[in-house]
Amino acid sequence: NIADYYINGLPKIGAWRDMHIRIKGPAVEKLQEVFLTMWNKETKQQIGGDEYFPFGEDSLNAAPVHAGHQVAIVQRAPKISPEAMRHAYIAAINSAERKIQIINPYFTPTSSIRRAIEKAVNRGVRVEIMIPGKSDISFTPDAGFYLANQLRKKGAHIYVYNGGFHHSKVMMVDERFCTVGSTNLNSRSLRYDYEINAFVFDLPVTAQLTDIFSADKQNSTIMTKEVYKKRTPWKRFVGWFAHLFTPVL
């Protein structure tokens, strides 16, 4: 996102926190392909050619592996790959054996994502989910608090970030691989919008994100039954009511 308040924050939410990733090598060409496809569609231009794809066409069809590093670019496009992102997230969650860590700003997960998280908890995986205490929008965060509390009841560990608005969309699995991208864990991202994520199979990169998560815990409140009840009855009602609309949020 590009705007002044993404850099300077907003008075009602404080500092804006986000997560970006720099990718080098053949995996970039998939990002280039997605960008040019949308650019050409909107501008009616036909930009392309070998100069934009120096690694060749093969790089678009396979995730490259170099010295133990693997990057897969997953795109969700409504008419091309409508289920790709949902399937990628569910597969990642289902693969977890020890730990899942999620940071997501508009956390109103679809029923299939919630079921995958609950199954992970039931098989002994520690699931840690970080959501922002403040948001740049209304209604959706109330549903997010309600749904996060429901997952807390199932055994997930919920952290409410207090250091501003955490707009990051990341997930780490077993400290083995991670994903960083534009995808929110809500119906809009998984069913309607254009989204793109990098799934990075790399221990050092995943360790960096894990360290950031651990540091952010120090600036977070652990959601407990008592903490959730501190929300006003009206806020709790709005959360319950809002969650009924999660299929379109």
How would you label these PLM feature ranges?
Residues 1-249:
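Charged, low-complexity intrinsically disordered terminal segments
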